[in-house]
Regions:
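Membrane-active amphipathic alpha-helices enriched in small hydrophobic residues
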Residues: 40-54, 76-91, 108-125, 144-161
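Membrane-helix boundary connector in multi-pass membrane proteins
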Residues: 124-141
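Charge-rich, low-complexity amphipathic helices
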Residues: 59-63, 76, 129, 133
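Short, charged, amphipathic alpha-helical segments
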Residues: 67-77, 102, 106, 136-148
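N-terminal targeting leaders of membrane proteins
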Residues: 1-73, 81-103, 163-165
Length: 165
C-alpha cells in the first residue's frame, strides 16, 4: 500500500501547486510605431498583387508595349512594400519573441512572408530578357515563381488578418 499511497500523494500534490503567473511583456514605443507602419503599408499588398497579376497575364498573352514598363513599376512597388514590411516585421518579431500570446501566428506569418520575399527576389532574377534568347522558357519560369510568391504572401497576409490569437 505504501507505493500506491506515495503515488497518489505525489499526484495530488502536483495538482495543488499552481503555475507561476505569466510575466507581463512590455512593448516599446518604437514597436508600436513599426507595427503601425507595417499595418498601414500592408493595406497596399492585395491591390498591388491584383494589379501585378493582371499586368503580368496581359504581358504573358501579348508581349510588348507599355505593359512591360507598367509591370516593372508595379513590381518595384511590391519590392519596396516588402522591403519596408520585412524590416518592420522582423524587428518587431525580435522584440516580441518573449511574448507567448500570438507567437505561433506571428511565426507562421513571418516564415511565409520571408519565403515570399525570397520568391519575389527570385522572380526579379528570372525576369525574361528578349535580347538573350530563350524568352518563352524564362517568362514561364518567371510567372511560376511570381504566382507561387504571391500565393505564399497572400497566405501570410491572411494568417494575420484572420488567424485569431
Amino acid at each position: 500500500m505504501a507505493p500506491l499511497h506515495r503515488a497518489m500523494t505525489t499526484a495530488f500534490a502536483a495538482n495543488d501547486q499552481t503555475a507561476a503567473p505569466p510575466r507581463a511583456v512590455e512593448y516599446s514605443h518604437a514597436y508600436q510605431v513599426r507595427a503601425k507602419i507595417h499595418r498601414y503599408a500592408s493595406f497596399a499588398t492585395l491591390p498591388l498583387f491584383a494589379t501585378e497579376v493582371a499586368l503580368g497575364q496581359s504581358l504573358y498573352n501579348e508581349p510588348g508595349g507599355g505593359k512591360k514598363t507598367a509591370h516593372a513599376i508595379v513590381g518595384a512597388g511590391i519590392g519596396s512594400l516588402f522591403a519596408v514590411n520585412t524590416v518592420t516585421g522582423v524587428w518587431n518579431m525580435v522584440e516580441a519573441r518573449k511574448d507567448p500570446v500570438g507567437r505561433t501566428k506571428r511565426l507562421v506569418h513571418g516564415v511565409l512572408m520571408l519565403a515570399a520575399d525570397a520568391g519575389f527576389f527570385a522572380t526579379f532574377l528570372a525576369a525574361p530578357d528578349s535580347e538573350h534568347g530563350e524568352f518563352s522558357d524564362a517568362r514561364s519560369t518567371h510567372r511560376t515563381i511570381a504566382i507561387t510568391s504571391v500565393a505564399l504572401a497572400t497566405a501570410g497576409y491572411l494568417t494575420m488578418l484572420f488567424g485569431g490569437k
